[in-house]
Amino acid sequence: VSSPSRTGPDRCPGTLRVHAAADGGLARVRLPGGTLSGAQAGALADASRDLGDGHLELTSRANVQIRGLRDGVEGELSERLHDAGLLPSFTHERVRNILASVLSGRDGGFADVRPLVNELDAELCADPELAGLPGRFLFALDDGRGDVIAQGADVALYGIEGGFALVLAGRDSGRRASPAGAVALMVEAARAFLRVRDGEWRLNELDDLGALGMGGDAERVAVPETVRRVPVGVLPQSDGRAAVSGLVPFGRLGPDALGELRACGEIIVTPWRGW
């Protein structure tokens, strides 16, 4: 059963379109794959301190939010984020919603999906048509471990032996892709949604997913429906190094924690409001 179609405009916030909240402006910064360098974390911390309330919020889509923004700072905020490499496209900033397996390429999984995140982000930003995707439309790249496939993505790839299954609104479509063709298949599905939508924001709001024309003949695989979170603590990697996973109380980082993140080489924000 489909969800009701939307009748109002898409008001999903970004950095160019700030949401007016009770405590001031709210800007949402997309982090494809949740990836953030220490320098970028520092840029976000500085922006929040200078323009907002000094905190960062982590979201369930592995993005970050700056709250308490003063009126009229959108231009300066956007310039800062662009200089930090966090706003590569002004036209497509709200459609860069991409989840990815948190430990992909570090330990486990059928494939390293990190290069696919970068490829998908570039393809989205290069296509003028895809700027029309709703701000809540979500992509996910799961390397087969099942940590992000159950997060409610509209278009997802799920790692299987030899490639990926295309998962639409949580269901295996029967289409398969090699790593080389994986991103093209995701973009094809997104374009199909734009062709058939009539005010809907999400795939599960369509009356008939078959209208997308994205079905295939492959034997269906079981798609996990329960999120498999990465454990908290020190996690050994296949290269002999270790990753450290932690949770952020209430998903809110204060000035002290933000200062410490500057020294990190790479940070992965998780959909369960941790890193």
Where are these regions (language model features)?
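A conserved active-site cap/scaffold subdomain adjacent to cofactor or substrate pockets
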Residues: 186, 190-193, 241, 246
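Flexible, glycine/charged-enriched surface loops at secondary-structure junctions
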Residues: 55-58, 130-134, 194-212, 218-230, ...
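Small-residue-enriched alpha-helical segments and adjacent helix-cap loops
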Residues: 2-5, 24-167, 172, 176-180, ...
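Short, well-ordered alpha-helical segments in soluble proteins
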Residues: 124, 190-197
